[in-house]
């Protein structure tokens, strides 16, 4: 049985004070949310400790946006698995396209981060996807298969979430057609040893398209960027019909 995972990725938004204001409106909106839906907030590092306290006992799990492969060391600006688990973090995004594009993340470093996340008790959300140029060149399938082959070396597929994020649809307002997203996610599933890995769609997910997205049989949830920053918007996504 595949799990439904709805994750908000706040990226580099929200101070601690702003995060608390968000929760005042967001948490009451989850009173009738089905318990079997896993709801996550993947927030900036500075928000993790206070949200760990604020979310205690709620339906919402806490997620980080990156993790280093070493337990500790001279890695300025990085954060380790034990540091995250100590404050109650359960999930961590690994290999987001913005990390790959702006910070030199490679499939090799993504793989190291995935293994480290699992080693220290975190469930990683692995992001894969193609650029518009790659899609227009017909490279979507080969690129994603290559990413999965390299990223998942020695990774436990019983403790894993995958997010398909077509890069050309992130923050652009262009949403991948739901049937096409379903097709690509089916391709991803066909490459896995464990067919029950939850696979999300990410890319301009909004309240007005969430019902159609979640009606697709291969899609097990969403990774939401901008629409997760407003409490009412993200609550509508979490409470999709």
Swiss-Prot record:
Query: Which catalytic reaction applies to this protein?
Result: D-glyceraldehyde 3-phosphate = dihydroxyacetone phosphate
Per the record's keyword annotation, is Hydrolase included, yes or no? no
Q: Report the GO molecular function annotations.
A: triose-phosphate isomerase activity
Q: Cystine bridges: which residues?
A: none
Catalytic residues (positions): 96 (electrophile), 165 (proton acceptor)
Q: What class of enzyme is it?
A: isomerase
CDD domains with a match to the protein in the record: TIM
Q: Which UniProt keywords apply?
A: Cytoplasm, Gluconeogenesis, Glycolysis, Isomerase
Q: Which domain of life is it from?
A: Bacteria
For this protein, the record's InterPro entries field holds: Aldolase_TIM, TIM_sf, TrioseP_Isoase_bac/euk, Triosephosphate_isomerase, Triosephosphate_isomerase_AS
Reported EC number(s) for this entry are 5.3.1.1
Q: Which family does it belong to?
A: Belongs to the triosephosphate isomerase family.
Extract the PANTHER family matched here. Answer: TRIOSEPHOSPHATE ISOMERASE
Subunit field text: Homodimer.
Query: What is the protein name for this chain?
Result: Triosephosphate isomerase
């Amino acid at each position: 049985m595949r799990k439904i995972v709805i994750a908000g990725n706040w990226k580099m938004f929200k101070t601690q004070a702003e995060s608390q204001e968000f929760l005042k409106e967001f948490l009451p909106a989850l009173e009738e949310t089905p318990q079997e839906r896993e709801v996550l907030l993947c927030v900036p590092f500075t928000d993790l400790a206070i949200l760990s306290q604020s979310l205690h006992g709620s339906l919402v799990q806490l997620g980080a946006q990156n993790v280093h492969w070493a337990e500790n060391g001279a890695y300025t600006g990085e954060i380790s698995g034990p540091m995250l688990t100590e404050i109650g973090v359960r999930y961590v995004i690994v290999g987001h396209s913005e990390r790959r594009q702006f910070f030199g993340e490679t499939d090799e470093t993504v793989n190291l981060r995935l293994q480290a996340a699992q080693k220290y008790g975190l469930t990683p959300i692995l992001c894969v996807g193609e650029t518009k140029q790659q899609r227009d060149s017909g490279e979507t399938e080969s690129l994603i298969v290559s990413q999965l082959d390299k990223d998942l070396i020695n990774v436990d597929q019983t403790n894993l979430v995958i997010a398909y994020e077509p890069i050309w649809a992130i923050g652009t307002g262009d949403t991948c057609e739901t049937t096409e997203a379903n097709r690509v996610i089916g391709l991803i599933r066909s490459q896995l040893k464990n067919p029950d890995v939850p696979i999300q769609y990410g890319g301009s997910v909004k309240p007005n398209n969430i019902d159609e997205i979640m009606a697709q049989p291969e899609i097990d949830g969403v990774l939401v960027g901008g629409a997760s920053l407003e409490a009412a918007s993200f609550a509508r996504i979490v409470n999709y019909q």
